[in-house]
């Protein structure tokens, strides 16, 4: 159910874009993201940091898009989110000396420190590449291509990278954890 809720604003954004335009889609995205946040609080009595950060960025960049009637703001949101994710991953590893991925998954998985570091850097690089790809597609290609890339391309890339990360983790698990 939670995974469905995470993707609901994206589905709403896409549907409103196809039915109306980028501004209706942006309005719908803001509302849908707020509803998901409220639902999460009511249902689970918890709001994840990433969900809250995403909502704030959706509200700010979406609000600027609507206020100035300029779709460039909502296009930048994707890159800003990915830059923040990459920055958090890199800072956790280089400044805090413990990769964020390890902080998130370390209780469930026993992996060598080197593997955690490589996985953390791989995700940071993934977010940087996706952010740069978003800039190129958002500002050099037609809007409808950017919307499709945002909805389907980035979702597919994230799913594929998650699966590849799972394979990488599995290869480095101690034998007793693989069963």
Curated annotation (Swiss-Prot):
Pfam families: IspA. The keyword Cell inner membrane applies. The chain crosses the membrane at residues 22-42, 50-70, 76-96, 121-141, 149-169. InterPro entries: YciB (IPR006008). Coiled coil: none annotated. The keyword Cell membrane applies. One of its GO terms (cellular component) is plasma membrane. Keywords: Cell inner membrane, Cell membrane, Membrane, Transmembrane, Transmembrane helix. It is a multi-pass membrane protein. It is found in: Cell inner membrane. Plays a role in cell envelope biogenesis, maintenance of cell envelope integrity and membrane homeostasis. Belongs to the YciB family. HAMAP family: YciB (MF_00189). This is Inner membrane-spanning protein YciB. It comes from Salmonella arizonae (strain ATCC BAA-731 / CDC346-86 / RSK2980). The lineage of its organism: Bacteria, Pseudomonadati, Pseudomonadota, Gammaproteobacteria, Enterobacterales.
